């Protein structure tokens, strides 16, 4: 029997948070640096209309998501966690990216029990269905929503999520720290 139900976002959580920046800069003829990405809304960061970015994204989403780089230690530590825990990837990605996302995880040899491509940023209902014990996320709004619903959230630090946290959210800086926190939680769970 596996112990914890771990829900993990993908973009900016297991992958580099600024994965979209190079292609976006080239397409929109901008020169935005990672340090300038201080909010979650990509169109706002780029200074373009939502509809203009949506058209760009629709035409380039497969390329954008296929080329994402994993964060250091993400693969190794998720695979270690998967031995004794359920790993559920829960992403707001467009549903048209479901097969690509399965392929990406397989290509990168990341172990998981299931993938939920929601097409929406609302993850609370899925966390409820999965009986989530801990959620790993990069979006500040998602972290607040999940934590306000009673979930423990590990928020991966980025330039765009450095806002005040509540008691259910812990800011983390890398996958080694995430692994350590989950192992501590696992020990507490086993002691009960």
Where are these regions (language model features)?
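Hydrophobic/aromatic beta-strand patches that form the interior of the parallel beta-sheet core
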Residues: 88, 116, 134-136, 154, ...
